[in-house]
Regions:
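A structural boundary/capping signal
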Residues: 1-167
Length: 167
């Protein structure tokens, strides 16, 4: 598959399907309310009761965090035997974390931001890198710690790989 074809598969599920940012616990949906700025209550819940969702649950409920979105992407990519990695970005100065996914196609590394309701200017657009080192260097140059967490994510458990950075 070409980069364009792969991105279209991912966008069809996550970009065009009305996903919301948040999570589900015991059938209850939790979403941040940003009307008054940062939602402290949601943040507290996301660091205490949130557990990584199964990609099938995320696709059924149409709600997920950045972790859940990249797991859906990986699940779809695995169906097409497309190699991918999940990365944790940590901005020390702002004490913020974000998980993203890259995949390999046409001898390139591709990053496609599909976290629901992302305010990033590149939401839904692919960024193509010549190789993994170019991708890593861009984030390191911009002050991020970046870690491969592909094998650290456990469905049904809290995202300890992420929470450890915030504590």
């Amino acid at each position: 598959m070409t980069i364009r074809e792969i991105c279209n598969v991912l966008r069809t599920e996550l970009y065009d399907n009305g996903y919301e940012y948040g999570f589900v616990v015991n059938g209850q949906k939790y979403k941040p309310n940003m009307e008054n700025g940062f939602d402290k209550e949601y943040y507290h819940l996301s660091t205490t009761i949130y557990c990584v969702q199964d990609p099938v649950t995320t696709m059924k409920e149409k709600i997920g965090t950045c972790v859940d979105a990249v797991l859906v992407m990986r699940w779809l990519l695995n169906k097409h035997n497309i190699p991918s990695k999940i990365w944790l970005l940590y901005n020390k100065q702002k004490n913020k974390v974000h998980t993203i996914l890259t995949f390999e196609a046409e001898n390139k590394i591709v990053y496609l931001e599909l976290t629901p309701q992302s305010s990033k200017a590149w939401y839904g657009k692919e960024i193509v890198y010549s190789n993994e080192q170019e991708f890593l260097s861009e984030y390191e140059t911009n002050g991020y710690d970046i870690s491969d967490v592909t094998d650290s994510i456990v469905i049904g458990q809290q995202p300890e790989f992420l929470l450890a950075k915030l504590n």
